[in-house]
Amino acid sequence: MIKITFPDGSVREYNEGVNGLQIAESISSRLAQDVLACGVNGEIYDLGRPINEDASVVLYKWEDEQGKHAFWHTSAHLLAEALQELYPGIQFGIGPAIENGFYYDVDPGEAVIKEADLPAIEAKMAELVAKKEAVVRRDIAKGDALKMFGDRGETYKCELISELEDGHITTYTQGDFTDLCRGPHLMTTAPIKAIKLTSVAGAYWRGHEDRKMLTRIYGITFPKKKMLDEYLALMEEAKKRDHRKIGKEMQLFMFSDTVGKGLPMWLPKGTALRLRLQDFLRRIQTRYDYQEVITPPIGNKLLYVTSGHYAKYGKDAFQPIHTPEEGEEYFLKPMNCPHHCEIYKNFPRSYKDLPLRIAEFGTVCRYEQSGELHGLTRVRSFTQDDAHIFCRPDQVKGEFLRVMDIISIVFRSMDFDNFEAQISLRDKVNREKYIGSDENWEKAEQAIIEACEEKGLKAKIEYGEAAFYGPKLDFMVKDAIGRRWQLGTIQVDYNLPERFELEYMGSDNQKHRPVMIHRAPFGSMERFVAVLIEHTAGKFPLWLTPEQVVILPISEKFNEYAEKVKTYLKMKEIRAIVDDRNEKIGRKIRDNEMKRIPYMLIVGEKEAENGEVSVRRQGEGDKGTMKFEEFGEILNEEVQNMINKW
């Protein structure tokens, strides 16, 4: 018999070789119907894969990321199976599950697969699903794998196999299709009830631009047709909210191939928005006793070797900068934390000095393949609202509570009222991969759990999801159309203090290692602005929007009066502009609605004579006429009421 430990700490005994489905069946028939995959000691298993030793087990359903992953991974194989029937001789690259669905990279030879072909491929996939084919996992020797795929002319698969170690190779078969794959997968294709292939694109083999361009087919599947219908409706709304489209319409940021791919440039209005966000966070951080620093955009290679970032980002980094005289290597900064560790080391530290809170809006650079770049959410240069807290082990909980306060203020002030968290803890069984003492880990993990409970924060606990250097708390927000975005992280780190030999003198006159806490409420300025645009559809909170008021004279002779109104509003610290183009008033209104400016003030002969403005509110239409001084007072009060909330 073997012992199976569940997430709630309960333990049951089963026969050796029991699988995830059998465990689910022993709990309830409903769970057995819903379960899609299982976690075994932190590794994701197919439901039919045997468990031969004591283990921690988590059962994953559609609602879980791991459940969706198995569902979409099998769907990728289903796509490949359909392509194999429709395009004889087609070769396959890779076909992973991704955040929303899956894709498969294929080489169709002389054939060309276009978007117009997708409905026929979908129909073939549905035909195969109707057969309810079993998905069978097999271990295979490296030589046998090379022969099997070589006999089929699968050059891409043979290249992958040649790089694998013997004894660690598995295949999955459904119907007449067999693929090289680690899994996990569903036990059959039967649960796949709704299929949509979404697009066709080009992708270089293995992401290298000097390799062959393959055809990448994207898709998504669901266990119910209703879910697909809801998803497609969501995608239509998401297109309207695309931050790249709105950012262009509002003139917030731009990209230039001449400057370089993935390198955003902030235009005046976008810069004003970003600086206002930074000033907002600065004020909060000052209240919470942070000290701001500035560090250089590059660092010596030795710094990143010490921190471990060279090993992690070295192959993905930009080319090193060589100093001609000293012969040293420098790299563009991939993270701010190594520099902050050096700042900590600059002075002897006592337990009385802690916690030390260092903050920086630091720009970092990481090389992303061109095919992975996406607007502001995936770029090669971005600015993190980074801070690192150096504290004693007994201060961890208090610091978590303070950071949670900051993140809550940030989210609520941006109208992200719906958010939750995930606590990532150690694997309960395999603890040898984690750095730091058991005592410190247990204290930190308990501190995070208690902090969430004290704040009444809904938090899901995930065992085995912690980084090797410490537990963390990730915040997920739901935007206006129900999408979940990961924004804001608090991460305990026992690794960097060890690597940099950070110390403080304790009350016992002995040297101790501090605990390091990483935190970034925004995550990065670029990603946060992108999410904020899509959440608000560009209609930012009034206090934040780059331009709060646009004044629209109905003809050129009222431009002078419009300028007078603007001057007064600016004296009231209201961001106002005049649209004095020689256009009809209807055209001006439409154009400025596109720019999402909250208030439009229309001025003509009557308004100029009476010192008034006709007020229009974005999305609400005509709000009547009033003295421009009265409007200024009302708007100023509206903004101050928003700011005073935080």
Curated annotation (Swiss-Prot):
Q: Answer yes or no on keyword ATP-binding.
A: yes
Q: What class of enzyme is it?
A: ligase
The species is Bacteroides fragilis (strain ATCC 25285 / DSM 2151 / CCUG 4856 / JCM 11019 / LMG 10263 / NCTC 9343 / Onslow / VPI 2553 / EN-2)
Its family remark reads: Belongs to the class-II aminoacyl-tRNA synthetase family.
Q: What does the note under cofactor report?
A: Binds 1 zinc ion per subunit.
List the catalytic activities from the record.
tRNA(Thr) + L-threonine + ATP = L-threonyl-tRNA(Thr) + AMP + diphosphate + H(+)
Its lineage opens with: Bacteria, Pseudomonadati, Bacteroidota, Bacteroidia, Bacteroidales
| Example GO molecular function | metal ion binding
InterPro entries under this entry? aa-tRNA-synt_IIb, aa-tRNA-synth_II, aa-tRNA-synth_II/BPL/LPL, Anticodon-bd, Anticodon-bd_dom_sf, Beta-grasp_dom_sf, TGS, TGS-like
Q: Which UniProt key words apply to this protein?
A: Aminoacyl-tRNA synthetase, ATP-binding, Cytoplasm, Ligase, Metal-binding, Nucleotide-binding, Protein biosynthesis, RNA-binding, tRNA-binding, Zinc
For this protein, the record's CDD domains field holds: TGS_ThrRS, ThrRS_anticodon, ThrRS_core
Keyword Membrane annotated: no
One family from Pfam that matches here is TGS
Question: Any idea of its EC number?
Answer: 6.1.1.3
Q: Could you identify this protein by its name?
A: Threonine--tRNA ligase
Its predominant location is cytoplasm
Q: Name one GO cellular component term.
A: cytoplasm
Q: Tell me, what does this protein do in biology?
A: Catalyzes the attachment of threonine to tRNA(Thr) in a two-step reaction: L-threonine is first activated by ATP to form Thr-AMP and then transferred to the acceptor end of tRNA(Thr). Also edits incorrectly charged L-seryl-tRNA(Thr).
Domain (TGS): residue spans on this chain: 1-61
Quick one: where's region Catalytic?
Answer: 242-541
Quaternary context: Homodimer.
Chain sites annotated for binding Zn(2+): C337, H388, H518
Q: State any GO BP term from the record.
A: threonyl-tRNA aminoacylation
Cofactor(s) essential for the protein = Zn(2+)
Q: Give its localization.
A: Cytoplasm
